[in-house]
Structure formats: structure tokens, C-alpha cells
Amino acid sequence: MRLETIRQSMRATGAKDCHIDRVLRAWTQAKPLESGARRHQPENFLPQALRTALPALQEELSALARVRSEHPGEDGSSRLLVELADGQTVESVLLPRDGLCISTQIGCAVGCTFCMTGRDGLLRQVSSAEMVAQVVLGRGRRKVTRVVFMGMGEPSHNMDNVLEAIDTLGTYGGIGHKNLVFSTVGDRRVFDRLPQQRVVPALALSLHSTRAELRAELLPKAPHIDPTELVELAEHYARTTGYPIQYQWTLIDGINDSIEEMDGIVRLLTGKYAIMNLIPYNATATLDYRRPSLEHITTLTKYLHAKGIRTTVRNSAGQDVDGGCGQLRARTLDAGTATDAQKISLKHLKTGTRSAA
């Protein structure tokens, strides 16, 4: 269901925009309808026809997304397995410090080799209403002031729904525009469309390598944009919006954790309005990748800091509860052990010298 469909159903009752806005504001903020009203009963500010239709509408909204299971993590996060109305499931993650990560697709077409979400390809799009419903579920559990579109799926492949959800959360949900984060592997449409929106979100860009050939192997179906050009496009967005770009880099042992790669980061990001988020890989039994040692992660972080690159280390939230993207859903679906054809080999992914000397 699209959010515009919800508006149209209320408009069909004769409701005016001010009435529709009131209902959307209450829903997206997970508050009672009378919350904040000068006159506290709905009959004082909503027309009779809309009040009559509200119970059925509220039931329909509640059915958009339900929590099938909740898995608190030791880091203060809580991973939610969310069941949609058709029985499909997605993951949402309540993050420390009032954040929420939501999913935009069931499956993913990009096929990042280190990610569980895309192993079966794209199953279907998540609608704008289903995205907002994930936020409503999260707000029913704790305070949410920041939403990142960084869960299952590639937001640029579901652009209309994602932008509609962002507009609704920024307009009615009480979330600051810079606290709505659009995450992407890099798609030219992102840089064209996002700055034109009423609600302009911050941008997170999945980089993972500064070498075009390695990045193409790690992200086989991402748009083929050279990392240098990608960073230039992102820098223009950062300067236009005033929001720093959050670069994401999944650190994989022996693949993209060499000092040569760090020098590539320095080359691309020096002088840029940017934050580099190093995300140590969250190991799974079905993918042949490893997480670098804590000592090596610390060495890389210090190296980038010394070169003037603002860097953070962000572990996947809820690592003790299948914290990597798509892992909880995969476990729930009882995927089992990967076949030889499914198991990813590292031999063809060549990396540079790893020494920090």
C-alpha cells in the first residue's frame, strides 16, 4: 500500500487535507489521535464520515506490519523480525541513541557478495506505507528520532516508495531532515532526485573499496561508476545539502583491509565533507568471509585518523543476534548450510599488502 492510497481513502470520505494531516501525524508519531489537540475528542476536529471510517483504517494500518519476534542485543540494540500483511518478513533494528534502521525491499538485486539479503535476489518492493509502519512499530517500543533506510534492500531501486516515506516522516513524523538517511550503493538517479525533494535526507554511500575492479566484484550488480566519480557526485550532494556523506566500508579480512586500500580512502576523501564508517564484517556460517582482528581494525582506524580522515568503527547492531543485514530473516527461514554453488569463494578477490609498516 502506498501512503498516497491512505490519503485517497480518507479524502473519499470528504476529509480535508487538515483532517488527513491530523490522522497521519498521529499515526507516524505513534500517538493517540487526540494527542496535541486543543479540543481533546476526535468529534471536535474530525468530520463524522472520517470518524466512521477510522476503525477500519486503523485496523488496516495495524495489519501493515507486525512484530513476529524481537531479539535484544547486548549493545542496547534490538532486532525486530517484522511480518508484513502478505506474510513476507523484513528486518528492522532499534539502534542505541534513538535510531531505527528499516528495510526497503524484500531481498535485493544488487547481490553484494558479503550480504545475506541478496542471496535469493529481489522478491518484492516494500511499499511506502510498510516502511512507515516499521517506524510506527519501533516508536511503540522506544523513542525514535533518527531513521536510516539501511536495512534489507537497495533504496534507489525502490525510489518512489522510499522518497514518499521520507517525505511523510519528515513532514508528519517529527523527524529532522538530516536524521533521515538514504543509504545507497551509488546510483546517478539518487544525486538527481534527492536534492529536488521537499524533505531532503542525508546520504550514506556504500563504498567498500576504492578500486573499481574489486568494488565491482563485491557489488556485482551495482551501477558501474568509478569510485573517484562516485565520491565527486557525493561531495556535490554534501555541499549542496550541508550534510556530510556517511561512507560505509564493510571490513573483510584479507579483502579490503589493506593499507593500500586505506591510502585509497585518504586519496579520495581528503578535503571532503565526509565521515568514514568502518563496519567489521559480521561472520555467517554460509559465507566464506572473515572479520579482521580487533588489533588490525584499531590499526586501520588510527592510520586514517593520522591522515586526517574522520573515521568511526561501527559494528553491526546486535551481533549476538544475527546482526548482519538479512541474517535474522535467513535464520528464520531455515536456510540451512549453503551449497557449494552458493558458497562464496575468496580466491578471485585479490587484495594488496596488509602490513601497516
Swiss-Prot record:
EC number of the protein: 2.1.1.-
Positions contributing to [4Fe-4S] cluster binding: 108, 112, 115
Keywords carried by this UniProt record: 4Fe-4S, Cytoplasm, Disulfide bond, Iron, Iron-sulfur, Metal-binding, Methyltransferase, S-adenosyl-L-methionine, Transferase
Subcellular location field: Cytoplasm
Signal sequence, start to end: none
InterPro entries with a match to the protein in the record: Aldolase_TIM, Methyltransferase_A, rRNA_lsu_MTrfase_RlmN/Cfr, rSAM
Pfam families registered for this protein in UniProt: Radical_SAM
GO cellular component terms, semicolon-separated: cytoplasm
Residues at the active site: 91, 325
Cofactor: [4Fe-4S] cluster
UniProt domain Radical SAM core: residue ranges: 94-320
Family matches, as PROSITE patterns: RADICAL_SAM (PS51918)
One GO biological process term: tRNA methylation
Gene3D superfamilies, alphabetized: Aldolase class I (3.20.20.70)
Co-factor: note: Binds 1 [4Fe-4S] cluster. The cluster is coordinated with 3 cysteines and an exchangeable S-adenosyl-L-methionine.
GO MF annotations in UniProt: 4 iron, 4 sulfur cluster binding; metal ion binding; RNA methyltransferase activity
Disulfide bonds: 101-325
Binding of S-adenosyl-L-methionine, residues: 153-154, 183, 206-208, 282
Family, as annotated: Belongs to the radical SAM superfamily. RlmN family.
Name the UniProt record assigns to this protein: Probable RNA methyltransferase Daro_1157
Source organism of the structure: Dechloromonas aromatica (strain RCB)
